[in-house]
UniProtKB/Swiss-Prot annotation:
It is an enzyme of class 2 (transferase). Its EC number is 2.7.7.6. It comes from Prochlorococcus marinus (strain MIT 9515). GO terms for cellular component: DNA-directed RNA polymerase complex. This is DNA-directed RNA polymerase subunit beta'. Its cofactor is Zn(2+). NCBIfam families: PRK02597.1, rpoC2_cyan. Zn(2+) binds at C248, C315, C322, C325. Residues 1295-1305 have a biased composition (Polar residues). SUPFAM superfamilies: beta and beta-prime subunits of DNA dependent RNA-polymerase.
């Protein structure tokens, strides 16, 4: 039986032939390269290159074998001698001490400049940090040289150098110096760690060092999470990008420019978009050729600067990328296969290195703008600027005075004398710094200029730093400062310096005066030690009797009794109990009050001081409270004290004894509803105290409580009578009929009782308590004074329980309490009332209670002087028990002078007390003897090293106070340099203490130091976030016009556009203009500095190009410019961290972000305004409109962040599985969307084979021509995919076979030439190969002993040559 030969099956990838052919060109030539002998040290990098070379040249098998041999070699030597590190291997270079010494010398000179007020605090900080950074770099070189020359086989050096473990920066910390660290705010601490881990850190260094270490750990933890989420978003946005076409046939391409004549790896694996010709028009690379490393080299050697290549950005394949535009798959360096999921590969390639990126960079505090392009003089000679030179003064960040070039010009150094040397020429670019003057004679090797290359205007930001005073004294301004008052929008007035100048603090002893002190001495007066400088007095507010107390701590207390109230008609009785002392007040009529407070304590107004001990309102047991009509209380329950009675009356009390038991029911010794006598045992060990009817409450056989209610029970069957009463009970007045046979001649409380045995009424007796309207008060309970506070006692009656409240208790309770409360009027809150005891004047054995209001005055103790206060001396002006009036002086404090000198009072300001004064002492001046004529006059300020006379120089900084023929007197001082626009915190003539803030320096620092770096920056770019304070971009091309405003600050910037219309731009405060007047600008160019908003950029580009080109081209061009910018920005972040990612990966992602446009006006199309739609789709629609003559749709391109793009994909299944599931699914349902299952994600979710790899189904046309006996595959095609019901994972080869055997051929029809090549490549001999080599085992084709295939089928296979005779 012969098997029917199927035609070529549908799974044939026709394209693979082409790719083989392409590759065949290169493979054999490479394979024939002769073996080369590499004689050099092989480190990690060389090893990497070696393996990669082997793989490219000789394929997998050879590489695997070679890698194995390399491994064996490594192990062999590792077993002979291990590379381990001991402390001895950490060798500190000897040059270290010299380098640190040099740095310290530099810093000392910087500090000296700062001390002399030549540079500002900011400049000092910058210089110090730069010095240390430079030292650290030089030390790294020293470490390298030390190892290289003295110990090249050192373990540490070998590991770091070969790249096996560690890197130079780690070795630097081990044997160099740890270097500068940042504090938690991210600012660099200008104290570096000079030691290394080998020498050991000091305690201070250890603490500083651990800041950075902790930050590192936290960073790493956050980084992994962030990077993982980034990868997820990237995968989601690009998961449906699959290589689906051979060639999209586009004519568009992107341009790659060489950097410094090199392309690096940027061309490798890309296809040329057009023929590449050299300078002589010879063809180097034909169109559509893959560029390999050797071709890339050829291009570089031909000095070609730009190459047009194909890119996923310009690919026109619908919803996918074609092979030609994508280029090589970097896994095997051959053209990418059809069906490859390049989107996911791109996402992983960008997301994976995320963990290696740092999170945040340090705010360097305006640090290290590396000295770019420093030019030194090569010869001795005279400097000459060309005629067109324009320069202006400039101060460098290190405080060096220099000049800045405003235009490009040529600078020459003409050799001096008869020197035969040629003149040195220096090209000075605009923005460069010059350190020499025109016509200046200079020596060789002098720094002449610092040439800046590229964009001069760096984006800067404003930062501030405080200037803190180092010594006490008086502030003086230099005239150059020209401070002016500036009012901001909120109306606050600040003082600002207009020019660079010095702020002086002239030394002196500054005294802080207490709040109410007044100076008692005039200015410019000589004082001795101990002279009184100022006095402060303390007064009594209300007057009264003085009491002097013993001093406490560092102050004495003077008490003045302003009011006192003696309770002369009460005896104070003291009782001792086991819990302490208890005091009672007994009045003359025998009433006893319990005192709530004890003598010696302090109380405040309104507090209860005593309770009436009243037995009249005490009950025997618990019970029910009822208020009779007439008795009323104040609504609010006053705290925990009960309800205050507002009107007296009768309180009714129905006794009831309640025992809380909570024991087992078996202990009950009486019955429910039984009548018992007082003293009956109701539960074991519990006895009733009253007679009455027992009620038992129980739950789950637990006895909860037993109630004994007094009264009598009357059985009654009459429903009418029973219904008049309730179980809660109600009061019945005397004489009212209740039930036959019962006379009631008193108030009764009647309750209805129903039990299982009987029904009836319980009549209970009621006790009455009469409550008076007003409580009785003892006499003399009020003291009034003409001035000052007064005292009074008030009696308050409070009921403890509210109307209808049931008190569950066995013991009795107190129903009414009478409180004595204390009230004081006109007392200030800080006054307290003291409780005292006094012996009775006539009888010593009797104690009385005295209440007093005290005014307490703390009198300062004498103090010894300290740095900011003089010594003080305090005198009391009153005696004990003296009567004083309100406003009398109680004590005066004098501030005494510490040392002799001259007093100066600050200038008086209206209504402001003098808070400080200064004494200029002898030690604040120095005398300098002079021989020649004095060169200075009184009031001049000099710094160290300034000439004072013809022979003498100043030895200190200060102000000249007097000049005579013999000597000059200098008052010591300290200058502080203040930069323009700094905020001054002190005025001229103010007195300051050490540590006070003098000014706030406002300086500009380059933003490069602390822009968002690393992961957050990548996220910012890919999410297309709008940055804060973004720059102003030019909307349309034109010429810039800049006009100065009326005041110094404001500037208006406008652009005169092509059609002569003027577009004015609003500038924000603090934005720097990046263009000059008259400059030609294009749409999308920066007008001011700051981060670029990508959405605005796209908008500006589109608006500008749209004026000159048709809509479609404008959209394409603007998108293309933005795409290149995005790719470069992302690359910059990764490159700065040393991570290499191929451009094509980023391009795939950026393509997804920029593929949509927003419809502005639908024209005659069926699109909706505001709809986001693929550019390609709009293009097709508009083309159709142009044929039919309808109005096309107007649109603008949009940039979507990766999250937005993921949610806006065509597939709602994919979008819903990403974020906002409910919203996405709801909208899809309302719109009746269909999901065409094009991407990977949607197929995975519903459990189909994914349309990539083997599940990729190729093109319809090919399938149609090759379908052979299985046309059903094409039964219903949608978008190049098979529908679910027809989807087969593989194409089955038809073979006659027994029902028990089925095989799924992996490779297709044996006649296929691909099969031949595969066999040859794998070295498979068809005659000897077994069937299994071509069949994928599945559940059905596992042969078992009793299940051999039928002989006829085997015969057929043998004929095919698929089975050997065995």
């Amino acid at each position: 039986m012969t098997s029917s030969k199927p035609k070529k099956s549908s799974r044939v990838r026709k394209t693979s032939k082409n790719s083989k052919k392409n590759n065949k060109i290169i493979m054999p030539t490479l394979a024939k390269t002769p073996p080369s002998f590499k004689n050099k040290v092989v480190d990690k990098k060389a090893l990497k290159n070696l393996v990669s070379w082997a793989y490219k040249t000789h394929g997998t098998a050879v590489t695997a074998a070679m890698a194995d041999n390399l491994k064996d070699l490594g192990f062999k030597y590792a077993t002979q001698a291990a590379v381990s590190i001991s402390v001895e291997d950490l060798k500190v270079p000897e040059a270290k001490q010299d380098l640190i010494g040099q740095a310290e010398a530099q810093i000392t000179s910087t500090e000296e400049c700062y001390r002399l007020g030549e540079i500002t605090e900011v400049e000092r900080h910058t210089k110090v940090i730069d010095t240390w950074t430079e030292t650290n770099e030089r030390l790294v070189d020293a470490v390298k040289n030390n190892f290289n020359q003295n110990d090249p086989l050192n373990s540490v050096w070998m590991m770091a150098n070969s790249g096996a473990r560690g890197n130079m920066s780690q070795v630097r910390q081990l044997v160099g110096m740890r270097g500068l660290m940042a504090n938690p705010q991210g600012e660099i601490i200008d104290l570096p760690i000079r030691t290394n881990f080998r020498e050991g850190l000091t305690v201070t260094e250890y603490v500083i060092s651990s800041y950075g270490a902790r930050k590192g750990l936290v960073d790493t933890a956050l980084r992994t999470a962030d990077s993982g989420y980034l990868t997820r978003r990237l995968v989601d946005v690009a998961q449906d990008v699959i290589v689906r076409e051979e060639d999209c046939g586009t004519e568009r391409s992107i341009v790659i420019e060489a950097e410094d004549g090199k392309f690096g790896s940027r061309l490798i694996g890309r296809l040329s978009a057009e023929d590449v010709l050299d300078s002589e028009d010879n063809l180097i690379i034909p169109k559509n050729t893959a560029i390999d490393p050797s071709l890339s080299k050829t291009i570089e050697t031909s000095l070609i600067s730009t190459v047009n290549i194909r890119s996923p950005l310009t690919c026109e394949a619908n919803r996918s990328v074609c092979r030609k535009c994508y280029g090589w798959a970097l896994a095997h360096n051959h053209l990418v296969d059809l069906g490859e999921a390049v989107g996911i590969i791109a996402a992983q390639s960008i997301g994976e290195p995320g963990t290696q990126l740092t999170m945040r960079t340090f705010h360097t505090g305006g640090v290290s703008t590396a000295e770019s392009g420093v030019v030194r003089s090569k010869i001795k000679g005279k400097v000459e600027f060309s005629s067109k030179a324009k320069i202006r003064g400039y101060r460098t960040p290190h405080g060096v005075e220099a000049k800045q070039a405003e235009v490009d010009f040529l600078l020459k150094i003409i050799p001096s004398g008869n020197n035969s040397n040629k003149a040195q020429k220096i090209e000075v670019t605009s923005g460069s710094l010059l350190f020499v003057d025109d016509g200046q004679e200079i020596d060789s090797d002098i720094t002449v200029a610092q040439i800046t290359s590229g964009a001069v205007k760096k984006s800067v930001e404003k930062a501030t730093k405080d200037v803190i005073c180092d010594l006490a004294g008086q502030v003086r301004y230099d005239k150059v400062l020209q401070p002016k008052e500036v009012t901001d929008r909120q109306g606050n007035i600040t003082l600002k310096a207009q020019r660079l100048g010095r702020l002086w603090v002239l030394a002196g002893d500054v005294y802080n005066l207490p709040p109410n002190a007044k100076p008692v001495i005039s200015t410019e007066k000589n004082v001795e030690q101990g002279t009184v400088l100022a006095e402060a007095s303390q007064y009594s507010e209300f007057g009264g009797e003085v009491r002097l107390r013993e001093s406490v701590g560092d102050s004495r207390e003077v008490q003045i009794v302003t009011t006192s109230m003696l309770l002369s008609n009460f005896n104070l009785i003291e009782e001792s109990t086991h819990s302490g002392e208890i005091f009672h007040l007994e009045s003359n009529d025998g009433t006893i009050y319990r005192l709530n407070t004890s003598p010696g304590s302090k109380i405040s107004s309104g507090e209860v001081i005593a309770d009436l001990a009243d037995e009249r309102f005490r009950t025997k047991t618990g019970g029910l409270v009822k208020y009779a009509p007439g008795l009323s209380v104040k609504k609010a329950r006053s705290s925990k004290n009960g309800f205050e009675v507002s009107q007296g009356g009768t309180l009714l009390w129905i006794p009831q004894e309640t025992h809380e038991i909570n024991k087992d029911i078996s202990l009950l010794m009486t019955e429910d509803m039984a009548w018992i006598e007082a003293g009956t045992e109701v539960v074991k060990d519990i006895f009733s105290q009253t007679s009455g009817i027992v009620t038992v409450t129980q739950k789950n056989d637990i006895l909860r409580e037993i109630t004994v209610r007094n009264g009598s029970f009357h059985e009654c069957e009459d429903e009418e009578v029973l219904n008049r009463f309730t179980e809660e009970g109600q009061l019945v007045n005397p004489g009212e009929k209740i039930i036959d046979g019962v006379d009631n001649n008193e108030i009764l409380f009647v309750q209805k009782l129903e039990t299982s045995k009987s029904k009836g009424l319980l009549l209970r007796t009621v006790e009455e308590f009469n409550i008076p309207d007003e409580a009785e008060l003892p006499e003399l309970t009020h003291v009034k004074q003409e001035k000052g506070p007064s005292l009074g006692l008030k009696a308050i009656q409070r009921l403890s329980y509210k109307d209808g409240e049931l008190i569950k208790s066995v013991e009795g309770v107190e129903l009414l309490k009478t409180h004595l409360s204390l009230e004081s009027f006109d007392a200030t809150p800080q006054m307290t009332i003291d409780v005292e005891t006094i012996k009775d004047k006539s009888n010593d054995s009797i104690n009385r209670l005295n209440l007093v209001i005290l005014e307490s005055i703390l009198v300062r103790r004498d103090t010894i002087s300290d740095s900011s206060h003089g010594s003080t001396h305090t005198e009391l002006q009153v005696k004990n028990n003296q009567q004083v009036k309100a406003g009398d002086v109680i004590a005066t404090t004098q501030i005494l002078c510490k040392e002799k000198g001259i007093v100066q009072l600050p200038d008086l300001v209206e209504n402001e007390p003098i808070r400080r004064l200064i004494v200029e002492r002898e030690e604040d001046k120095i005398k300098i003897n002079i021989t020649g004529k004095a060169l200075v006059k009184v009031g001049d300020r000099v710094v160290d090293g300034d000439s004072i006379s013809e022979g003498e120089k100043a030895t200190s900084c200060g102000e000249i106070e007097e000049v005579s023929s013999k000597c000059v007197t200098l008052r010591l001082g300290r200058p502080y340099m203040v930069s323009p626009d700094s905020v001054l915190h002190v005025k001229d003539g103010d007195l300051v203490l050490r540590g006070d803030g003098l000014a706030l320096l406002v300086f500009e620092r380059q933003k490069t130091g602390d822009i968002v770096q690393g992961l957050p920056r990548i996220e910012e770019l890919l999410e297309a976030r709008r940055p804060r304070d973004s720059s102003t971009l030019c909307k349309r091309s034109g010429v810039v016009q800049i006009k100065e405003g009326n005041d110094d600050e404001s500037v208006s910037l406008s652009v005169i556009e092509r059609d002569d219309s003027i577009n004015e731009y609003q500038l924000l405060i603090g934005q720097n203009i990046m263009v000059s007047d008259g400059q030609q600008v294009k749409g999308g160019e920066l007008l001011t500095d700051g981060p670029i908003n990508p959405h605005e950029l796209l908008d500006c580009l589109f608006t500008d190009i749209k004026d000159q080109k048709p809509l479609m081209d404008a959209a394409r061009e603007s998108i293309s410019k933005l795409q290149r910018r995005m790719v470069n920005e992302v690359q910059n972040v990764y490159k700065s961290q040393g991570v290499a990612i191929d451009d094509k990966h980023i391009e795939v992602i950026v393509r997804q972000m920029t593929s949509k446009v927003r419809i502005e006006d639908a024209g005659d199309t069926t699109l909706l305004p505001g709809e986001l739609i693929e550019l390609r789709q709009v293009e097709d629609t508009n083309q159709a409109m142009s044929i039919t003559g309808g109005a096309p749709a107007e649109f603008t391109p949009v940039l979507l962040g990766i999250t937005k793009a993921s949610l806006n994909t065509d597939s709602f299944i994919s979008a819903a599985s990403f974020q906002e599931t409910t919203r996405v699914l709801t909208e899809a349902a309302i719109e009746g969307k269909s999901d065409w299952l094009r991407g990977l994600k949607e197929n995975v979710i519903i459990g189909r084979l994914i349309p990539a790899g083997t599940g990729f189904s190729g093109f319809v046309e090919e399938l149609a021509s090759e379908a052979g006996p299985h046309p059903d595959i094409l039964a219903e095609e949608s978008g190049g995919y098979r529908r679910a019901q027809n989807l087969r994972p593989d194409y089955t080869v038809d073979m006659p076979q027994s029902p028990t055997v089925s095989s799924t051929a992996i490779l297709d029809d044996p006649s296929d030439e691909d099969l031949e090549t595969t066999r040859n490549r794998h070295g498979i001999d068809p005659s000897s190969s077994n069937f299994a080599a071509f069949a994928r085992p599945n559940a059905e084709n596992q042969f078992s002993e009793d299940q051999l295939p039928d002989p006829a089928a085997l015969e057929g296979l043998q004929e095919e040559g698929l089975l050997s005779d065995e």
